[in-house]
Amino acid sequence: KKIICFVTGVPGAGKTLVGLKVATEHLDKDKGNTSVFLSGNKPLVDILQEALTRDRVIQERLNGSKITKKQARESVKAFIQIIHHYRDEYLRDPKAPYDHVAIFDEAQRAWTKDQTVKFMHQKKGISNFQYSEPEFLISCLNRHQDWAVVICLVGGGQEINTGEAGISEWLSAIENQFSDWETRISPNLFDSEYAAQTSIEHLKQKCNVEFNDSLHLSVSMRSFRAEYLSKLIKEILDINENASFTLN
């Protein structure tokens, strides 16, 4: 089967860490369950690649093996990539991706169809590209004949730059193009900051949708001794006076 999961969490709850844990724990080439962690945040990817490269060299030495930093970096780059490099690779290559599991960090920042088409035409010289970024990325994993998993790590209200679609673009892509995929959603995706309520309702009418409380990370690791802090801030931003007063 093919499944797409949406993981939500308060700021600092560790969504990126969850994605990295999945990616690093599923590297078994023999079992065919390798994963790739994808992010559009280049500074983050650079830091992660460097840190994991150094760690790989140290671990190999502790195990009595020798590996150069260049060799270690190549292995790390296989499972932590810039999302645009991944996209460009499978524009050129029509085969199914090497990985069966793809984790998209900050999935809400994927591009709309208009932004993606414009970029492909102006920067890549591709005039017949007609997908939003979520549509194309899901289509890559959909090339697998047996199974595939997409994990979207979602930050609420964190669409920052021009053309960033929000999580509704992913939900619309599933509804319109990949309705045979099973969908697992954090119930918190209904919250106002995700602006996805209407898209979820449409998706429920057409697709196999299941809600799972475990897909929400509720406590910020930055303030783990004040577990209600994030909820308090949310209630204030939602102008929920009663809830804010109670929590305060």
Task: Pin down the residues of each PLM region.
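Hydrophobic anchor at the beta1->P-loop junction of P-loop NTPases
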Residues: 7
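The conserved Walker
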Residues: 11
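Conserved glycine(s) of the Walker
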Residues: 14
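Walker A/P-loop NTP-binding motif
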Residues: 18-29
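Conserved helicase/translocase motor-coupling segment
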Residues: 19, 163-164, 188-248
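Conserved Walker A/P-loop ATP-binding site and its immediately adjacent core
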Residues: 34-53
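Structural recognition of the conserved hydrophobic beta-strand(s) that form the central parallel beta-sheet
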Residues: 37, 103-105, 132, 136, ...
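Conserved RecA-like ASCE ATPase "motif II neighborhood" in helicase/translocase motors
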Residues: 69-141
